[in-house]
Amino acid sequence: MTDLTPREIVSELDRFIIGQKDAKRAVAVALRNRWRRKQLSDDIRDEVYPKNILMIGPTGVGKTEISRRLARLAKAPFLKVEATKFTEVGYVGRDVDSIIRDLVDAAIVETRARMREDVKSRAVKAAEDRVIEAIAGRDAREQTREMFRGKLKRGELDATVIEVEVADTSNPMQMLDPTGQGQMGMMNLGEIFGKAFGGRTTRRKMTVAESHDILMNEEADKLLDDEVVKATALEAVQENGIVFIDEIDKVCARSDMRGADVSREGVQRDLLPLIEGTTVSTKYGPVKTDHILFIASGAFHIAKPSDLLPELQGRLPIRVELRALTEEDFVRILSETDNALTRQYKALMKTEKVGITFTEEGIKALASIAAEVNRSVENIGARRLYTVMERVFEELSFHAPDRSGEEVTVDAAYVEKNLGELARSTDLSRYVL
């Protein structure tokens, strides 16, 4: 749980996402309210529920990125799902309860990784002992062990092939699990038999370098209490979990359509108790969804937010509209953000010892072409920049190993040379860009 103020949260989001001030403020307040709730006394804390958010805006404007960055800031369990993947209970497909089960699975992995860090020093020592034992034998003298330990730390043994016993992670009984049943608190035959045959090990040959992470994770897991990991992960999900439901507009039954799609409306009805607050059975234990923050998003090109079930609209009280991105926004995305594509391509080409310099005119030309193709073909927002950049660098990326030591300046002329003809031809850009 982070104690950042709303202003600090927005400032952090500004490093990666251009514009969309309203959406940033809404999620910043929602996250800060989590911290405020923690400060309350027990009698009122359970009465304070998160205000779920509905983001409305075209594709590629930052809806998903805002939620993903928010979860990283909060160090909270996060899951992104598409509403279109789910079907009403009773139909073939996934039911919405699997959202919470997937969120718990993600939280278990995150919690275990974080707890491994706490015991890392002891785990590294134990992993080193196993490597030394595999090289020098169990009966080696202490002096010999210390000699090998020194070589190991200096990396002199990294290429040495050793044979070690590691846990056998394959589960031959997995086929006994009906799809999803093991997740539902029902009898999980695969897990029962897996435990019966559990503790199995297998001997594997690998280099010392390859064995490091495998053995360290095994030794760390021996030092962790599985029940503590589960309890911590479940608490994190219930108190801090964030679920991002994309494409919510695709499960709207439009008011102007005759005979509404039963399954679409059914998905909305199944989402109601989940967002309102219910208890979902998972293989790690029951999870209450009352205090999980749900952020739904959709483009709403055809359907309208009012086409959602009235009950679902009421459970998404905060609405923010994200505007379409302009050419000026694209210039800022390419030059100001911490994860700008220009920086990424510079770093990629640097591995081939090719220097890249972007001029201001070059960045403006890239932004101009992306905006023009969005206008003339289909507006996919900032994602268009990926296509444009890949096209501009296609030739250089292919020949980079042969151009080691060169310096390349990406200016307006360079962009025109690599992309101009494609951008001008509407027919070509429709298929290529």
From Swiss-Prot:
State whether keyword Cytoplasm applies.
yes
The record's section on CDD domains has: RecA-like_HslU (cd19498)
Positions binding ATP in this chain are 18, 60-65, 246, 311, 383
Q: Spell out the SMART domains in the cross-references.
A: AAA, ClpB_D2-small
GO MF annotations for this entry? ATP binding; ATP hydrolysis activity; peptidase activity; proteasome-activating activity
CC terms in the record's Gene Ontology section: HslUV protease complex
Q: For this entry, list what GO says about its biological process.
A: protein unfolding; proteolysis involved in protein catabolic process
Q: Where in the cell is it found?
A: Cytoplasm
Write out the entry's keywords from A to Z. Answer: ATP-binding, Chaperone, Cytoplasm, Nucleotide-binding, Stress response
Q: Does the keyword Chaperone apply?
A: yes
What InterPro entries does UniProt report for this protein, alphabetically?
Answer: AAA+_ATPase (IPR003593), ATP-dep_Clp_protease_ClpX (IPR050052), ATPase_AAA_core (IPR003959), Clp_ATPase_C (IPR019489), HslU (IPR004491), P-loop_NTPase (IPR027417)
Q: In which domain of life is the source organism classified?
A: Bacteria
Q: What does this protein do?
A: ATPase subunit of a proteasome-like degradation complex; this subunit has chaperone activity. The binding of ATP and its subsequent hydrolysis by HslU are essential for unfolding of protein substrates subsequently hydrolyzed by HslV. HslU recognizes the N-terminal part of its protein substrates and unfolds these before they are guided to HslV for hydrolysis.
Record's subunit section:
A double ring-shaped homohexamer of HslV is capped on each side by a ring-shaped HslU homohexamer. The assembly of the HslU/HslV complex is dependent on binding of ATP.
- Family membership noted in the UniProt record: Belongs to the ClpX chaperone family. HslU subfamily.
What is the protein name for this chain? ATP-dependent protease ATPase subunit HslU
Species whose genome carries this gene: Cereibacter sphaeroides (strain ATCC 17025 / ATH 2.4.3) (Rhodobacter sphaeroides)
Encoding gene (name): hslU
